[in-house]
Amino acid sequence: MYEVLIERTAERDLRSLSSPLFLRVIPHIRALAENPRPGGCHKLVGSKNDWRIRIGDYRVIYEIDDRQKLVKVFRVRHRREVYR
């Protein structure tokens, strides 16, 4: 089982979400502790350990450290904003 760490930038992103969207995203983030590479996740091009999961029009960007069993969530943003 992995530890999930939510970085400050992701905390800010989560606070800005509407309540229904927040309630939709949080279970996906928690599930990363069990399986950091769920079906439908994609490795980001040009990075070693960065991944993304898609939740509707939103993306969760995170890094996996297999040695430390750690998942760091960096961003939770709309798809048109997340890669800027």
Segments from the language model and where they lie:
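Basic, Lys/Arg-enriched alpha-helical interface segments
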Residues: M1-I55, D66-K72, E81-R84
